[in-house]
């Protein structure tokens, strides 16, 4: 793994302790190769360090574009209109180890982990009267949550990965750490979430980690682990909080007209469009809108979204340009101030629907599915049995998150990659470890089949 020295500006509009609106980050320079003693020594530097963790999460290599593109391009909703053969590898479900996208994502995620590790290691030792116990716990809890999310994202792309829990001070420090199993990697995710939860406040914040953000990731985590009861339990915690979270209508309300931080959002990443830029719009928008349209909805997705019985209000996700070409319109703000959506309440409804279906609670699961359909201005769906309900949920997730990076991961985790994607080689369900990492660290082993 490479240790990268980075300076990102990430502005917050109000102080770290407030939890009611988007908070813009102050200047952040959390160096990963300087003396540890100079990094976090008081309240100000502790706040700076946690901002640096969020800035790494928002980076273009992670939720800013690259990591999410793995989910988009590997599914069956998007076509690549550009000329780079490496991007087409995702569409073809045949990604090579020298693919620059996976290398960029790997480095960005481990950079995020390293910054979180720095906070986790140093903030508990800070003695500053201005750094209250509550604020100290919050900062540490946020770092644990983000590290949990990072390892979760690593596990679902690469399987088992090296588990690094101490901050990197020089680029060679993490050389020689072997990969853990996928089970051990997911165990690290849960351990970090269990640590984060009691440290975090119970307030609602759509841009910072709280207990509620932990519940959202726990619900998704347990879905991947097939622990249906736990997945249902944590989804229900958020759905029950209807004062703060609800399926807002019409469907486009959570993103259209420059909306951000709506009641639809459980956790989204803020970009101001100047010092923090979300590069998604450049890939989705057309040339006349200042983009490249290199990611575009394919014909099957366009048909599904534009058919009233299946797409409903979700047809707002796509639009036509002056050349009669369809393009994705979830990310449209210029210059690049769209949020990145990490958790929406719609996902929690569909997670609970799936968990309930697996538990044999067909009517309750169908009610959750139909809540999402109703918000999309669709007629209620029907399902006579568990299998029918699971298939209906799968189809709904494809359209509800048509331009969000869920589809590939959904189909792989449910064991339907052969049926849906015609991918029969299970080695292809995870991606190769980037060749640059293998060359620099002989302790790393490649995934089978690559």
Task: Go through each PLM region and give its residues.
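Acidic, glycine-rich segments characteristic of secretory precursors and extracytoplasmic regions
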Residues: 2-4, 18, 22-71, 443-450
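Bacterial Sec-type N-terminal signal peptides, specifically the leucine/valine-rich hydrophobic h-region
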Residues: 16-19, 151
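Short, surface-exposed recognition loops and adjoining beta-strand edges that mediate ligand/DNA contacts
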Residues: 36-37, 64-85, 161-165, 201-281, ...
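Conserved, well-structured interaction surfaces
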Residues: 47, 85-158, 195-204, 335-340, ...
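Hydrophobic-face positions in mid-chain alpha helices that act as interaction patches
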Residues: 78, 84-87, 230-345, 415, ...
